[in-house]
Every structure is written in structure tokens, then in C-alpha cells.
Swiss-Prot record:
Organism the protein comes from: Synechocystis sp. (strain ATCC 27184 / PCC 6803 / Kazusa)
Subunit-structure text: PSII is composed of 1 copy each of membrane proteins PsbA, PsbB, PsbC, PsbD, PsbE, PsbF, PsbH, PsbI, PsbJ, PsbK, PsbL, PsbM, PsbT, PsbX, PsbY, PsbZ, Psb30/Ycf12, peripheral proteins PsbO, CyanoQ (PsbQ), PsbU, PsbV and a large number of cofactors. It forms dimeric complexes.
Keywords: Membrane, Photosynthesis, Photosystem II, Thylakoid, Transmembrane, Transmembrane helix
Gene: psbX
Localisation: Cellular thylakoid membrane
Topology with respect to the bilayer: Single-pass membrane protein
Family, per entry: Belongs to the PsbX family. Type 1 subfamily.
Gene3D superfamilies: Single helix bin (1.20.5.510)
Domain of life where this protein originates: Bacteria
Purpose: Involved in the binding and/or turnover of quinones at the Q(B) site of photosystem II (PSII). PSII is a light-driven water plastoquinone oxidoreductase, using light energy to abstract electrons from H(2)O, generating a proton gradient subsequently used for ATP formation.
GO BP annotation list: photosynthesis
Name recorded for this polypeptide: Photosystem II reaction center protein X
tRNA-binding keyword on record: no
Length: 39
């Protein structure tokens, strides 16, 4: 694997992590709050 290809793959992985992790945490947080307000 060339260094530039490795850097490209790492940027994809980091980009996905930066987007997906806060989105997942946010969804879990909202669903937890939603459950509390309903019951």
C-alpha cells in the first residue's frame, strides 16, 4: 500500500468516526430522554 493510499483510507476512517460517533451518541441520548418524558 502506498503512503498516499494509507493516508486517504485513514482520512475516510477518521471522517466516518467524526460524523458517526456524535450522531450515535446524540440519537441514544435523545431516545433516552424521549423514553423518560413518555412514561
Amino acid at each position: 500500500m502506498t503512503p498516499s493510499l494509507a493516508n486517504f483510507l485513514w482520512s475516510l476512517v477518521l471522517g466516518a468516526a467524526i460524523v458517526l460517533i456524535p450522531a450515535t451518541v446524540g440519537l441514544i441520548f435523545i431516545s433516552q430522554k424521549d423514553k423518560i418524558t413518555r412514561s
